Amino acid sequence: MAKIVDIKGREVLDSRGNPTVEADVILEGGIVGSACAPSGASTGSREALELRDGDKSRYLGKGVLKAVANINGPIRDLLLGKDATDQQALDRAMIELDGTENKAKLGANAILAVSLAAAKAAAQAKGVPLYAHIADLNGTPGVYSMPVPMMNIINGGEHADNNVDIQEFMVQPVGAKNFADALRMGAEIFHHLKAVLKARGLNTAVGDEGGFAPNLASNEDALAAIAEAVANAGYKLGDDVTLALDCASSEFFKDGKYDLEGEGKVFDAAGFADYLAGLTQRYPIISIEDGMDESDWAGWKVLTDKIGAKVQLVGDDLFVTNTKILKRGIDEKIGNSILIKFNQIGSLTETLEAIQMAKAAGFTAVISHRSGETEDSTIADLAVGTAAGQIKTGSLCRSDRVSKYNQLLRIEEQLGGKAPYKGRAEFRG
């Protein structure tokens, strides 16, 4: 038994300079597992609650001392003496103690930090890497794959102070022979994109996730700049590299319309579905996240019927890593993929349940960071340990993003051929 003898919480900073929660779970024998909770900017209304203090005299009200106190008090008291390797029992106990639908009492940030720290401590106690422990918890021991990275190299929307409405423009090195090759390709494209933007006299400052954040004439202008960078890097768009979008449509859905302020265009759901379909015809876009508002299920149905057979349609704000909401999407044939974010649901156990439900229904599962991140690289191990096949963890700069890529390099080196990189086969169409 990997007996928990102490739990400690603390307030640390995320990549935006805002407080977040870190937890240590300490086992008999001195083993320590540590984990941080991430934080989002464009958040779904149905996400589990991130508990913040609201005290304007500290960190502009964003302090997390209440969540930390919950770790050091009731959560610690609850879990002392328990077995860290029994992840389900730990998570269920915390969920039951909280007693709310959205973890509003203890805070999803408090519960998640402890949940992940316990998993890390348990992996050490077993003498295995974290990804191997996660595979065991997932019921798929020894089954691994290296994820295709979806690299966010132009930022807009809530992730940047520019006029671009679509939040993320991503490249996917689907033609790479392994993850290390994919990372190199992405980095080369990133540097060529900087040169393309500089040549156009555009800003090359980066946004929250490390992508460039220039003002552009249109969303399509961003795609054209990326296409030029891909070609300049010596790769063939559509073969070596494909494209993906995160529209984060809930951020520009106003009064029942999709309002692209940067382009001066307003669409109803059918019109916006046509707009997105047009982009997929002109560019090799094989994945679109949050193409409709989180509450516009009718719009999602229109989009799914129009392009869902050939394009991965990912629900982020729509599904919020929640199996109850995902089940509705599966039953109604809304979308065909789920974005997986630990802190939307607030525990490792519930995260694994969402991945399992998605895969059983033929949906893909994309493991994702948040725009407010730390050096914690747990999502890299989650992607490999669940053989999810895809990961979103930002651009090719900022160590809060690169820490995940570097962990994936280490894992690929450890596993060798036991973790295949499947490239284009991970996607639809």
From Swiss-Prot:
Binds a second Mg(2+) ion via substrate during catalysis. PROSITE patterns: ENOLASE. One of its GO terms (molecular function) is phosphopyruvate hydratase activity. It is found in: Cytoplasm; Secreted; Cell surface. It comes from the Bacteria. Its main location: cytoplasm. Keywords: Cytoplasm, Glycolysis, Lyase, Magnesium, Metal-binding, Secreted. It catalyses: (2R)-2-phosphoglycerate = phosphoenolpyruvate + H2O. Its cofactor is Mg(2+). The active site is at E209, K341. It is an enzyme of class 4 (lyase). Coiled coil: none annotated. Pathway: Carbohydrate degradation; glycolysis; pyruvate from D-glyceraldehyde 3-phosphate: step 4/5. Gene3D superfamilies: Enolase-like C-terminal domain, Enolase-like, N-terminal domain. GO terms for biological process: glycolytic process. (2R)-2-phosphoglycerate binds at Q167, K341, R370, S371, K392. Disulfide bonds: none annotated. Mg(2+) binds at D246, E289, D316. GO terms for cellular component: cell surface; extracellular region; phosphopyruvate hydratase complex. Its EC number is 4.2.1.11. Component of the RNA degradosome, a multiprotein complex involved in RNA processing and mRNA degradation. Catalyzes the reversible conversion of 2-phosphoglycerate (2-PG) into phosphoenolpyruvate (PEP). It is essential for the degradation of carbohydrates via glycolysis. Belongs to the enolase family. This is Enolase. It comes from Ectopseudomonas mendocina (strain ymp) (Pseudomonas mendocina).
